[in-house]
């Protein structure tokens, strides 16, 4: 999935927890 883009976001570490809630985002 496009997880790379999520990690590159300004959220950084927060992206990990957020990814669990919105894995399709």
Swiss-Prot record:
Family label: Belongs to the NmU family.
Keyword Secreted: yes
GO-annotated molecular function: hormone activity
Keyword Secreted: yes
Keywords: Amidation, Hormone, Secreted
Asparagine amide found at: 25
Subcellular localization, as worded in the UniProt entry: Secreted
Name of this protein: Neuromedin-U-25
GO BP, sorted A to Z: regulation of smooth muscle contraction
Superkingdom to which the source organism belongs: Eukaryota
UniProt source species: Oryctolagus cuniculus (Rabbit)
């Amino acid at each position: 999935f496009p997880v790379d883009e999520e990690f590159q976001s300004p959220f950084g570490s927060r992206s990990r927890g957020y990814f669990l809630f919105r894995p399709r985002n």
